[in-house]
Amino acid sequence: MVQSSMTESNRTASGTPVPGRAWLMLALATVGFAVNFWAWALLSPLGPRFKDGLDLSSFEQSLLVAVPVVVGSLGRIPVGALTDRFGGRVMFPIVSAATIVPVLYLGLAGHSSLAALLVGGFFLGIGGTAFAVGVPLVNAWFPPERRGLAIGVFGAGMGGTAISALTTVKLVDANSMSTPFLITAGVLAVYAVAAALLLRDAPGRTVPSEPLARRLAATVRLPITRQASALYAVAFGGYVAFSVYLPTYLKTGYGLSQADAANRMAGFVLLAVAMRPFGGWLSDRIGPVRVLAASLTTVVAGAVAQAFTPALAPVGTIAFLAMAAALGAGSGATFALVALRTPADQVGSVTGVVGAAGGLGGFLPPLVMGSLYGAYESYAIGLVLLAIVSAGALAFTLTAVRAPHAGGEGKARTGRRREPRTSGTTA
């Protein structure tokens, strides 16, 4: 049993051929994810400007950038379940087209008051649900031993937030407040048409027949749903929190200009994006548990170091870049675990719940950081809390997640490659 498992675990990625069309679908899905995330993140780089122009408090500014996050996160639950039912070919064009509406509203009329921005930000959250469309689409096209890498590559589409960070403020300064929103709406429209024409679901895709409510209830009962939700809330939630709040943190804590803070946030995002497919690829080889453990350990160390508010160069920069790399790799490893342990006809539903947990994990920290800074004029307590939560996630990974569960998860692994062992036991 042990020898057979080890042989299967060590099989090279080249052992199972992947059709060229699968790579095309992966590319299309990744582009769609990036474009929708670009739209989803449009408000974050402009947060400091809205704060000054509308005389917002630190909490109001945090709320403004957090609203799209929570809506996009909760929306992933029904969107993931709908993707299981109707497929990515239908859902990707719908989500992309629907996101155009709040983008145009914000660019043309919705930036004159906090109330208008919150309304626009609420519906801007639609763009954040694209993640729950792409994962089941990509998962169905690739064999089990390639899914960690494939979903990691798809996850790199979260780099759409870097596009927003690098371009939004510059476009506003060079033209007008409406410019970045109009450009993004145009790109979304082009992608929606391209996806409708070119995107295809995998042959033989499993279509669930149960009602939506029953499928969601069954999804929540799966051990992998609860495990991955907890881990993704820390890994991806940390990434989202930094991507929306880092410009404010750097401007307030280190006195950087808005443009400089946005550029540094873009660097953080790009590194996290690059490390996400690496985390998936590495999970295919040594197992997602090991990758998660290493990633969470790095986050603990980086958060503790940054809690002392060191000089930005070099210690602060190193701490943030280390956390960016770890959060990206950890996000990739989490969905490698999902791909490994989830039944084929429930990948969309599980992705929706796990993705929601990750987004909600990114919703609370900006609010906490804004409130703590308003009360104490320091971010140290917030970073200590990040270290504590990450340490708890590390302990959870090495205990509950590391040990296989019986029941639903056992069925999920039927006919699929075993996860590489994280120890010499046969448990």
Give the ranges of each region predicted by the language model.
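Extracytoplasmic gate region of multi-pass secondary transporters
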Residues: 43-47, 224-277
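Juxtamembrane intracellular "pre-TM" segments in multi-pass secondary transporters
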Residues: 10-19, 201-229, 416
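Hydrophobic core of transmembrane alpha-helices in multi-pass small-molecule transporters
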Residues: 115-129, 233, 315-329
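Cytoplasmic helix-loop-helix junction between adjacent transmembrane helices
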Residues: 120-157
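Conserved MFS/SLC helix-loop-helix module at the cytosolic interface between two early adjacent transmembrane helices
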Residues: 74-111, 283
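Helix-loop-helix hairpin linking two adjacent transmembrane segments in secondary transporters
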Residues: 153-200
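C-terminal transmembrane helical hairpin of 12-TM major facilitator-type secondary transporters
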Residues: 286-334
